[in-house]
Amino acid sequence: MMDNNEPISAEHGQAGENLAMNYLLEQGLTFIERNVRFKFGEIDLVMKNGKEWIFVEVKYRSKSQYGGAINALSSGQIKRLRRAAEHYMQLNNIDAICRFDLIAVDAGQIQWLPNAF
């Protein structure tokens, strides 16, 4: 049996991000950038809704056991994502409203939590 805490393969992570991105595009958001990496954190998806910038964390689980993807986000990950988003906005001279969304993908089912944290 696979331990739910094992890192998922990059291929599965990319598949989850593809599902999330396509879902958000269907909801009317605009894609800006993907997999923005800094030494202290990564942003899975950068999207926009009008003038609002949206930083999206995608959590993927092939099975919804052990609490599923929605419960896989730690306080440390939230802190790193916030720091990465702040740095991203500074680097790109963005002075706008932003929010942090979570997309949880469990066995192909998508849950979108706007303003998740």
From Swiss-Prot:
Cited CDD domains: PoNe_Nuclease
A GO molecular-function descriptor: nucleic acid binding
Coiled-coil stretches noted in the UniProt entry, renumbered to this chain: none
One Pfam family named in its UniProt record: UPF0102
SUPFAM superfamilies for the chain: Restriction endonuclease-like (SSF52980)
Domain of life: Bacteria
NCBIfam families recorded: PRK12497.1-3, YraN family protein
PANTHER family linked to this entry: UPF0102 PROTEIN YRAN
Family, per entry: Belongs to the UPF0102 family.
Name of the protein in its database record: UPF0102 protein Ssed_4252
